[in-house]
């Protein structure tokens, strides 16, 4: 029997700037059946500049087009002073809490909180110094691949291994918000594991739960999905985030998918043996006089 797939509730910007909402989101993730909750650790001034030049305006055919990068990140970030309490609440709830650091100062802050896992976000997968620094802490590393080429993935995996860190999970991801299901290419989950000799999984931006269910059949060891208390609260990520009721159903569906996979065996189950006893048998007969 394969190991259980870890289900991660990605909070991202879905606290909408309110610490009370962030805390309740952690508690709701537990109620919905998540195994872990993930934060993002950055500040606008650590990853971009406040600048009105064209290169600093989002123009990628996304739901955020027309906004300045600085303004979006300023709206979306999780204040660093919240992190300790959020980690504490998650621990109270029996959840693993980890984060995506976007620079070395974020790694340092998370180390002070004994962050148990580091995830490198899709847009940071070419930041080899960041990957090396996080990997050097010898915690499990998760790499998202939403904009990555094969070479990008290879270099990122090699960066982890150079630091003596071989606990690597590579997530299939499509950095489109929401992502069209026809671009999910979930068959890559199995290929990622085989090609790079790592664990693999899914960071999902499609709508609904079809992709997570299919991901399990492709050997996913981790499934991450954006999670929100209620889409009506708004925020940068609300349109492609899953509410508690739907997330809970997704968790049940994923567990059922795992259960249905079972194991490779030709032994008959008890039910099969019972049915076999009712099967037709060869009969010979002779004419009676």
What are these regions (language model features)?
Residues 1-289:
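Catalytic cores and adjacent flexible loops of soluble metabolic enzymes
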